[in-house]
């Protein structure tokens, strides 16, 4: 689940495998390989955790691209958005160019901006806390996870024209319950009521000869809530105004209202709750934008890691329930990878030594009736030319069963005496092997 964050995107093609990365601390470094397209991308956060590499699987040397490193000087600087383009490259629909926008500057554009479709996010008051997308030979698709900064709501938009005598701007304390739209060839006016009975507007509707036809959207608030909007804006009677609107909830799409014409807009957004609107109105609805907040503001607790200090730090947080764990093991744990029920694959953590990859083992978890609750295992010395302190064995405990142990139990044992929780993700250190491992659990856990 999207704990305290909102998913925007992805943009790009459908090739490659799903992946996602959510930083435990602020993102401080982005590493891309690029030439005529974005070959691969990886990330590092302020704690030193690295994400693994997404894309970059084309084995040809001339397709590796040039390395570009973006350093973000947190805490005075933080990443707030991205923009770029996607299009055809070697017969694949992939990310062609990328720019990274912070509160201080824009880094890029990297890649080729010629041809293809461009994308950007009209967003304010946000911090990028992670990325998601698809990757294979190249970076096929890319989106972001965002949180409000410092606390509260994120602003999207406005879309529409620059005119309008009356600016409006409101946020509700409950939920958007009723939306009253007057429309004809455009959106003449709009008004709102929240779950506490407070009314906002109407905004627009000052042409007495063209007030439009009234339509009403009613939202329950318990079973249904507003998550986003989409629409069009363009010329209407010589004014650049909002010409059509749709209101998207977790259940359905209401609309479109008005007449779709001109430039279209939409926000590919998940995990959101619309808490207010902003824009301008006059004769008609000149422009409109939304305030959103994460639907789920719950966080997680980090436990561990156990193991050695070698390798590089890594972390993985699932979008939904973890339903598959891929373990390569021999006399120790060589590598780990994860998959969740949204289809996202993690990077592979460990397994860098090509001469010692181990045997593949797969744990399948029948989520949601079965869910991961804890891990246990051992760590100690493992020798392959050099001596490493690594995770030597691992078991995975669910509410129904224990899977493992995998590897060979030796050295120091560890376990987590933990109840009534769900494992949301993993963290640790990895290089040639799995050097260390810990878990992220929900905050109501009793340890």
Curated annotation (Swiss-Prot):
Stated pH dependence: Optimum pH for hemagglutinating activity is 5-7 with activity decreasing quickly at higher or lower pH.
Temperature dependence per UniProt: Hemagglutinating activity stable up to 50 degrees Celsius but diminishes with higher temperatures and is absent at 60 degrees Celsius.
UniProt entry keywords in alphabetical sequence: Antimicrobial, Lectin, Repeat
The Jacalin-type lectin domain, residue ranges: 5-148, 153-294, 300-443
S-S pairs: none
InterPro entries listed in its UniProt record: Jacalin-like_lectin_dom, Jacalin-like_lectin_dom_plant, Jacalin-like_lectin_dom_sf
Tissues showing expression: Expressed in seeds (at protein level).
Activity regulation annotation text: Hemagglutinating activity is slightly inhibited by alpha-methyl-D-mannopyranoside.
SMART domains named among the record's database cross-references: Jacalin
Entry GO MF terms: D-glucose binding; D-mannose binding
Family note: Belongs to the jacalin lectin family.
Its job: D-mannose/D-glucose-binding lectin that also binds derivatives N-acetyl-D-glucosamine and alpha-methyl-D-mannopyranoside. Does not bind D-galactose, L-Rhamnose, D-fructose, lactose or glycoproteins fetiun and mucin. Shows agglutinating activity towards human and rabbit erythrocytes. Also displays antimicrobial activity against L.infantum.
UniProt-recorded name of the protein: Mannose/glucose-specific lectin
